Amino acid sequence: QFEYWKKDFNAFTTQFAKEPLEGNSYVDMIDIESVAKFLITFNLVHNMEINHPKSVFLHKEGNGKYVMGPIWDFDWAYDYEGTSNHFGRYNTPLFSSSMNGVGTAFFQRFLQDSRVKAIYKRTWQDFKNNKLDALLQYVDDYAVMLKPSVERNSELWENTRSFDTKVKELKTWLRNRADYIDSEAVSYT
């Protein structure tokens, strides 16, 4: 089975690498809406894992298209990579020429396709206008649920004593990051 999937995925990547990208039939092999949503998720939380993907998944059922996800491994998110601190810079691009990882080249290529960019822009604008506030409320609700555990944990470990401050920092960072992504997505046509 491994050889079957290896051959199948290699066929996709070979097609994806062909020029011109516009009109390229690679879109018959991967769900580009799932790609756009995947990119939005990683961009919103600035998960640099995408640049050197050792924890990136996609899946495919039968003769269907590849679909990005499930998502996981977010320990290098929220500006942690390179700084070892969360919630610092919110205005840093997800992709960087200094990264030079295989993920950088692979995922940036999707954003060279106007079909993906159009889905990205539409999906992002819908999220920002209609769902961001719900996400921030979820952060508050989840923090309330975690509070008893955080208090017990703080009896042993000092790193959770600033929990309330970190929740506020997370929400502020997400709002600022969303505004930053707006400035990127507005140019997508």
Identify the function of each model-found stretch.
Residues 1-52, 56-188:
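Middle-to-C-terminal accessory/interaction subdomains
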